[in-house]
Amino acid sequence: MKFDVIIIGGGLAGLVCGIRLAEQGKYCAIVSAGQNALHFSSGSLDLLAKLPNGQAVSQPLSALETLAELAPEHPYSKMGQTGQVGELAQQAESLLSRCGLSLVGSAAKNHLRLTPLGNCRPTWLSPADIPVAPLEGPLPWQKVAVIGIEGFLDFQPQMVASALQEQGVEVTSDYLHLPALDRLRDNPSEFRAVNIARVLDLPENLQPLADELARLSSTAEMILLPACIGLDESAPLEALRAAVGKPIQLLPTLPPSLLGMRLHQALRHRFQQLGGIVMPGDAVLRAELVGNRITGLYSRNHGDIPLRAAQMVLASGSFFSNGLVATFEHVYEPILDLDILSLPNRADWSNSNMFAPQPYLQFGVNTDNRLRALRGGVALDNLHVIGAVLGGYDPLQQGCGAGVSLTSALFVAEQIVSAMEVTL
């Protein structure tokens, strides 16, 4: 089986890279081992929220020069300074829009999004259906009703209300009861956001839901709900807003996250619409190397039949997705045993304070400045690395996980197109 490009991993980075390559006429395949981390995502995308020294960042693009001094191994530092990463961030915003995603925000300045705990945290892009606020000044909401769903344990309205009250917002909290959900409620393991959304999205449940929300939010100017409506699109939420006559915004729930799933579905649909091939439930087990070039990939489902392409992209994710594997002695990349940025002493891998930066989060594959994978200190000619499997950055403490995935994906797509034009 032969393609122009094979991408190992179907998460945010892999899909975005595949979309950009397919938009430029490349025949791409994505080998995806299973459910990716987007299903656990809030739907918001971070670019850069903190520098490695802990300094908060309000304007991500203006902080890249300082970041390069503090963290030369950071993917942003390798991809270039403000101009390069800023251009890639703008390209990412345009690409996501072409996928039909309605997002708010700009790479020029972070904004605040409301979390499921009622706190605010800075981010780059957020779904239009979640509550956001400017980085400075008081919150824009005066009277809010936070309404949960009776029996739904993955969202606690009182916790959100308490946090908002501490920030000066007048809040009420309550639970709605809808008879249509009673069958699901009898089985707690089935009472999850995705299954609830399938019920609430039905047209016959719109008016009963609207009546219940109107009853519980009589004095409120805005309603906050758990993200349990609009499984495939925002039309059910828009209809509910019209029926209630008030702004209604969604807060992410515990996984599986409906907002993250919608992001994944939109990206995958766009990739396949452009002619891309997705091989779900498969995993690349080994690679065939001739010199510094990969000539074939062997996967679990295809056995001895190699997958061949002129260019390969590793987007296999971090430990969560088995893109990196840790033993008691060391961390390694399981397909090609690529060079890893890590620490030799296991005692240094983690910090006993769970809220402190964890060194292992910066572990990942080492690359050259073109994001080509290093193996034995030598760059492989046709293997680029993108997303969470990259080393040199802390996606949680630095608030840059999605940004690295998006910008590295687009950066590598450009590298691949240029390389393939040279070889034609």
Swiss-Prot record:
GO terms for cellular component: glycerol-3-phosphate dehydrogenase (FAD) complex. Its EC number is 1.1.5.3. It is an enzyme of class 1 (oxidoreductase). Pathway: Polyol metabolism; glycerol degradation via glycerol kinase pathway; glycerone phosphate from sn-glycerol 3-phosphate (anaerobic route): step 1/1. It comes from the Bacteria. GO terms for molecular function: glycerol-3-phosphate dehydrogenase (quinone) activity. It catalyses: a quinone + sn-glycerol 3-phosphate = dihydroxyacetone phosphate + a quinol. GO terms for biological process: glycerol catabolic process. InterPro entries: FAD-dep_OxRdtase_2_FAD-bd, FAD/NAD-bd_sf, G3P_DH_GlpB_su. The keyword DNA-binding does not apply. Its cofactor is FMN. SUPFAM superfamilies: FAD/NAD(P)-binding domain. Keywords: Flavoprotein, FMN, Oxidoreductase. Composed of a catalytic GlpA/B dimer and of membrane bound GlpC. HAMAP family: Glycerol3P_GlpB. Belongs to the anaerobic G-3-P dehydrogenase subunit B family. Conversion of glycerol 3-phosphate to dihydroxyacetone. Uses fumarate or nitrate as electron acceptor. This is Anaerobic glycerol-3-phosphate dehydrogenase subunit B. The gene is glpB.
